[in-house]
């Protein structure tokens, strides 16, 4: 089957609805929607839940942008895209809970296609999901990775190990020499063996996010926490900000190409703190995190 951007868009809109509905059902609060238009072509729906019962902030963004020509920054690395019209669409989300025992989660799925008359389209899918705990629980990590493995299984035995490694490699803070979290799945430039296969995998990843995350939320939401745990959560959120602003390709590309800043920075935690040369107390649960987020086979 030839690439069908319309079907992808319809799936992404339904996915945004589904994820927002499930997060709201767990939290009790509702998302506020901000629909926006892009002057150069396209637009999106940004939805944010603030100060809910469980989630301090959850942002779920859908965007669909298109144009007659790719920005120069994009064609510099992919000269085959020069002179082509393009469409780029996706759903991206980040959830920052109040409770430090509930991890932060991130997911996105996206599709890109560039076309010109008389030539085959250039297209690919990308996406994934990853988990950033503040306090490590092995059963949560095993569930997260088992869900990732199980959704990958129908697409081949090598898919989960390959995309897990890509995720571990990608969500790494080089300036800190540490992982952002315990990873999950990350894939990009997926266009083989054919459109139907790739689209099915992207759908599996998108639909798998809530299956991976919400059982962890339910398991941890009643755990009692205090000022110590909150301060550590805010400190570790600093790593999240550092990664997004220094290393994340999507954030940098969006800001450098005139993307919608409010939507791009929706992933930022609402509160965060830095403290010069802070070190956790030896033997404490906070100190245990650095070992917990080391790359390993969880299943």
From Swiss-Prot:
Keywords recorded for this protein, A-Z: Cytoplasm, Heme biosynthesis, Metal-binding, Oxidoreductase, Porphyrin biosynthesis
Associated pathway: Porphyrin-containing compound metabolism; protoporphyrin-IX biosynthesis; protoporphyrinogen-IX from coproporphyrinogen-III (O2 route): step 1/1
InterPro entries: Coprogen_oxidase_aer, Coprogen_oxidase_aer_sf, Coprogen_oxidase_CS
The reaction(s) this protein catalyses: coproporphyrinogen III + O2 + 2 H(+) = protoporphyrinogen IX + 2 CO2 + 2 H2O
UniProt cofactor(s): a divalent metal cation
Subcellular location: Cytoplasm
UniProt-annotated site: Important for dimerization, residues: 175
Stretch list, region Important for dimerization: 240-275
HAMAP family linked to this entry: Coprogen_oxidas
Role summary: Involved in the heme biosynthesis. Catalyzes the aerobic oxidative decarboxylation of propionate groups of rings A and B of coproporphyrinogen-III to yield the vinyl groups in protoporphyrinogen-IX.
Protein name: Oxygen-dependent coproporphyrinogen-III oxidase
């Amino acid at each position: 089957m030839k690439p069908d951007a319309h079907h992808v868009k319809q799936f992404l809109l339904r996915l945004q609805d589904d994820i927002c509905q499930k997060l709201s059902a767990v939290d009790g609060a509702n998302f506020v929607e901000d629909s926006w238009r892009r002057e150069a072509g396209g637009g999106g729906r940004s939805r944010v839940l603030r100060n809910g019962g469980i989630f301090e902030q959850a942002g779920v963004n859908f965007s669909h942008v298109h144009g007659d020509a790719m920005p120069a920054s994009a064609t510099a690395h992919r000269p085959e895209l020069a002179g082509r019209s393009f469409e780029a669409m996706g759903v991206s989300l980040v959830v920052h809970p109040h409770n430090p025992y509930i991890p932060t989660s991130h997911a996105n799925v996206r599709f890109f296609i560039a076309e010109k008359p008389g030539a085959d389209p250039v297209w690919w899918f990308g996406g994934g999901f990853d988990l950033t705990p503040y306090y490590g629980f092995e059963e949560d990590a095993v569930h997260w990775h088992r869900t990732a493995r199980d959704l990958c299984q129908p697409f081949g035995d090598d898919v989960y190990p390959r995309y897990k490694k890509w995720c571990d490699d990608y969500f790494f803070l080089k300036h800190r020499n540490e992982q952002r979290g315990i990873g999950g799945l990350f894939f990009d430039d997926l266009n083989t063996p054919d459109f139907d296969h790739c689209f099915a995998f992207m759908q599996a990843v998108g639909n798998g996010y809530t299956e991976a995350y919400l059982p962890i939320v339910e398991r941890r939401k009643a755990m009692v926490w205090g000022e110590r745990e909150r301060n550590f959560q805010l400190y570790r959120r600093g790593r999240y900000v550092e990664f997004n602003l220094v290393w994340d390709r999507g954030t940098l590309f969006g800001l450098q190409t005139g993307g919608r800043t409010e939507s791009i920075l929706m992933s930022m935690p609402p509160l965060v703190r830095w403290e010069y040369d802070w070190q956790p107390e030896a033997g404490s649960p906070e100190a245990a995190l650095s070992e917990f987020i080391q790359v390993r086979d969880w299943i």
